[in-house]
Amino acid sequence: MDIVLEICDYYLFDKVYADVFPKDGPVHEYLKPAIQSFSEINFPKLQNWDSFDTNSTLISSNNFNISNVNPATIPGYLLSKIASYQDKSEIYGLAPKFFPATEFIDTSFLSRSNIFREVLSLFIITTLFGWLLYFIVAYLSYVFVFDKKIFNHPRYLKNQMSLEIKRATSAIPVMVLLTIPFFLLELHGYSFLYEEINESTGGYKAILWQIPKFILFTDCGIYFLHRWLHWPSVYKALHKPHHKWIVCTPFASHAFHPVDGFFQSLPYHLYPLLFPLHKVLYLLLFTFVNFWTVMIHDGSYWSNDPVVNGTACHTVHHLYFNYNYGQFTTLWDRLGNSYRRPDDSLFVKDQKKEEEKKIWKEQTRQMEEIRGEVEGKVDDREYIDQ
């Protein structure tokens, strides 16, 4: 994310922050007392576990006893342990890395490394990029890929597409806000993101291996999170809004409850905190994830691959609720006994209208049976055939 942020700072934000939040300007003068008070806070520090005796240390290493715990030193110890994972050379904003310094770089009291500026910048960038990617990819999928016969499906909702768009556009900013702490960790050197491609980092071979590792790790994480989201109490509170869409359009891809979307994005953010990942590949993979999310909601069934959890598999999930929780592969569904093979009828092209209606009727019958078990008798959806 530091690459994107520095591009935006260089071409736009440095000047904007200099104009809106200049040093010694009205906003700065108003906030100076609060800034001064914050800077004078004495945060606890602890340099080394072994340098403290039993009178002042967290715990005596020679005489371990819970009664020897000194609560006053716990925050300092935890802070020192956290700091030991920080790569200070990766802290964003201390010095430009990719572009020369602009004439405005030091003219705002909100410097590039200021956490409040970072939060605001990240929120603006990620929200706008999220909206842009969502609308562009979903629109292209709708025009060129989406099977518009779905509009006639008995479980298509009244005004469904506009409802999907409304849900997605309102959810994206909240999802961004919830994920900003992960971006801040990356910007402050608490991740394994790197930019140099050389022998010490494994070269291009390591980068190629990072792709399947990222897919497998996130596929596993999302599978278990998705199953958790189908626990009855969690489903009712968080995941049900996404299952409002029994049959989907590409615009359903991001139509989540924002907290649901946040939980399902966690594996993507955890991966670079745990494993090495090239910074450019990181951005490409995040873009790919958004493409994939749209693709599996586009209602176009190209392949019945036994390994890839494609559009057909995800259609089964929306129709029948309790199957195909995976994101990219069918591996964890097979291991977790939740895999359901898509019906062959999904892959028949140019089906006769009467046969299609018969298939949809059977889908609806099975769906209603399972929906009743998952959601209860009352269904608050408004279908086109009502």
From Swiss-Prot:
The keyword Cell inner membrane does not apply. Residues 214-337 form the Fatty acid hydroxylase domain. Keywords: Endoplasmic reticulum, Iron, Lipid biosynthesis, Lipid metabolism, Membrane, Oxidoreductase, Steroid biosynthesis, Steroid metabolism, Sterol biosynthesis, Sterol metabolism, Transmembrane, Transmembrane helix. A motif (Histidine box-3) lies at residues 314-318. A motif (Histidine box-2) lies at residues 239-243. Pathway: Steroid metabolism; ergosterol biosynthesis; ergosterol from zymosterol: step 3/5. It comes from the Eukaryota. It is found in: Endoplasmic reticulum membrane. Belongs to the sterol desaturase family. The histidine box domains may contain the active site and/or be involved in metal ion binding. This is Delta(7)-sterol 5(6)-desaturase. The gene is ERG3.
